[in-house]
């Protein structure tokens, strides 16, 4: 069969498999690619190729993850699967892509286990909008009542963590059966993908969000003015656009973009993902510096205090050798900026051990442009000791 040309017209969605160890996450991932490959929508990926997950570095943290891609009739998916529990925690808190939805795998033979609960909580903390449940190993359970019990437990658990437990699709299947080509279980994988298509919402594309660019470098061109360079994070910027420059005490600085350049070529507009230089009217070179953010006016505000979900590196990962306590003051590396901040631990938490995953409140020494979902690294003496993402802005 001739290879289909990669089609960008389908909307792109990031998903992943989560759930307790040995409940069948990786087998399901392999089964999805196998079943979709038969329908010409995916490349087949074997269990072993997914299980031997390569190491990646993200914000100074090593994470083992496998990336698989596939399509349904309606969407293009990038799917992540992690081998170990710690890799899941790290990937969800500090990984590259925000998950737009997740497939939580639960074995019908066991029902929900501690990591099932932990992964659902984590999905809630990092704002994964919706989960779909795949009840695996149903070919090993003869008792219909047992299946209904597991389904009830899962719905209760989802509701407890503020997901829509009543309406979340729960598919009963067998990943191994589907992987082995048994038609009744292959159909269940197709049913699962249909549920993911319909239940997981389409993410807002970066290009459709308001314009925002963290400043990486600044220089001046004689006779033309000041140029700020950086990678556009979201949105679109055109010549003539009014922008605001915020962070590092530059509150309310406004300017007009008089040119957008990329590799010394003039662009009509810069888009999310482009590395550009913006020529800014009426701004002196010393008024703007690395770490500030340029955005459309009023779309993003500077904040000093926020709540965050963080993962603290183990000693073996290059992290701290000792725990830290309340009022710990490391540096927070946010976008292109290093800023000192003070950590307040949740009530009743005395200290945080290397390897822990915890919700903290941070107070920075000055306001920084930030938003919910923004990921950052925690550094001490130039090395990364943790990573996290903002879950709530306080002030």
UniProtKB/Swiss-Prot annotation:
Residues that coordinate or bind Mg(2+): 26
Region called G5, residue ranges: 174-176
GO cellular component: a single term: cytosol
Keywords assigned by UniProt, alphabetized: Cytoplasm, Elongation factor, GTP-binding, Hydrolase, Magnesium, Metal-binding, Nucleotide-binding, Protein biosynthesis
Enzyme class, broadest EC rank: hydrolase
Binding-site residues, GTP: 19-26, 81-85, 136-139
Predominant localisation class: cytoplasm
Listed GO MF terms: GTP binding; GTPase activity; translation elongation factor activity
Region (G1): 19-26
Entries under CDD domains matching the protein: EF_Tu, EFTU_II, EFTU_III
EC number of this enzyme: 3.6.5.3
Localization per record: Cytoplasm
Stretch list, region G4: 136-139
InterPro entries assigned to the protein according to its UniProt record, in alphabetical order: EF-Tu_GTP-bd, EF-Tu_GTPase, EFTu-like_2, EFTU_2, G_TR_CS, P-loop_NTPase, Small_GTP-bd, T_Tr_GTP-bd_dom
Residue span, tr-type G domain: 10-204
UniProt family annotation: Belongs to the TRAFAC class translation factor GTPase superfamily. Classic translation factor GTPase family. EF-Tu/EF-1A subfamily.
Free-text function comment from the UniProt entry: GTP hydrolase that promotes the GTP-dependent binding of aminoacyl-tRNA to the A-site of ribosomes during protein biosynthesis.
Name recorded for this polypeptide: Elongation factor Tu
Natural source organism: Porphyromonas gingivalis (strain ATCC 33277 / DSM 20709 / CIP 103683 / JCM 12257 / NCTC 11834 / 2561)
